[in-house]
Amino acid sequence: MTSASIHIGSYTSTTNGNTTVVKAPTKESLSTCLSATATTTSPLDSIDIYINTSDLPTHYDSLALASIVPSLSPGGVLSVHVVSASSSAASNESAAVDVVNWSAITTSFVLAGLKAESEQRDGSGGRVYTARKATASQSASSAAATGRINLGGAKTKVKLSLDDDDDDQLIDEDDLLNGGGGMLAPPPTIDTEARAKSNLDDCGGRKACDNCTCGRAEQEAADAAGGPNEQQSKSSACGNCAKGDAFRCAGCPYLGMPAFKEGEEHLVLKLNDDV
């Protein structure tokens, strides 16, 4: 069984002859300490990392553990020993233990792909964290659990065509024109002769039209013959009958009627109240 012991920072101790001791005096040297040692070329069954409590915040690198794990054999154990001083310096380190970030060690296990197994504490404030590297079978089962499921069926390719119009409902253009499909009704028939006859009677001018049917021609003929003139029978001395109520006198026969043009008195007199 081969093993290695890594001493970080100011930690010093004696080990047995079967263990390779590697020094990592600085935080930066932790990731390369094993690769720089020729005696650790073969995979190790166990790696023990020792560090004093006072050096943990400044000398332990959570990312460096990932560079050490490749030297560990599958199923091998890695332990981090955080040692507290046992002599007169214990009183000085006891205060430092309370502010130590212990999660840095467990975080380094996760980043290195190790499975944490145990955490032990001693009476002096030290702790030992143990983790194990996965075996080849465990790595394969983990990859299979997270991989895609293959049902073994033959792969089929689906082809889509943009010219596939089998599902389109086509409409006959002739049905839109003749109304056979019930979508458009034929336009109504216009009686052009009736429209022409109605347009012949147009008394909008100063005189009645030749084909007058509204009675204006008869009225004009009676006026020209000296017959009863409704305009002459209804008038006032003010002479403002055609201008509207604002200009009419109190005895004007056209009070309450709209203004009119000279010569159109007969049209105003024929207006009937709708109320």
Swiss-Prot record:
Residues that coordinate or bind [2Fe-2S] cluster: C203, C209, C212, C214
Main location: cytoplasm
Keywords: 2Fe-2S, 4Fe-4S, Cytoplasm, Iron, Iron-sulfur, Metal-binding, Mitochondrion
Subcellular location: Cytoplasm; Mitochondrion intermembrane space
Chain positions covered by the region annotation N-terminal SAM-like domain: 1-147
Motif (Cx2C motif 1): 238-241
A Pfam family it matches: CIAPIN1
Cofactor annotation: [2Fe-2S] cluster; [4Fe-4S] cluster
Placement of sequence motif Cx2C motif 2: 249-252
Region feature Fe-S binding site B, mapped onto this chain: 238-252
Coiled-coil blocks: none
Binding-site residues, [4Fe-4S] cluster: C238, C241, C249, C252
Region (Fe-S binding site A): 203-214
Keyword set includes Kinase: no
GO biological process: iron-sulfur cluster assembly
Job of this protein: Component of the cytosolic iron-sulfur (Fe-S) protein assembly (CIA) machinery. Required for the maturation of extramitochondrial Fe-S proteins. Part of an electron transfer chain functioning in an early step of cytosolic Fe-S biogenesis, facilitating the de novo assembly of a [4Fe-4S] cluster on the cytosolic Fe-S scaffold complex. Electrons are transferred from NADPH via a FAD- and FMN-containing diflavin oxidoreductase.
Subunit structure: Monomer.
Family the UniProt entry places it in: Belongs to the anamorsin family.
Written domain comment of the UniProt record: The C-terminal domain binds 2 Fe-S clusters but is otherwise mostly in an intrinsically disordered conformation.
HAMAP family linked: Anamorsin
Name the record gives this protein: Anamorsin homolog
Native source species: Thalassiosira pseudonana
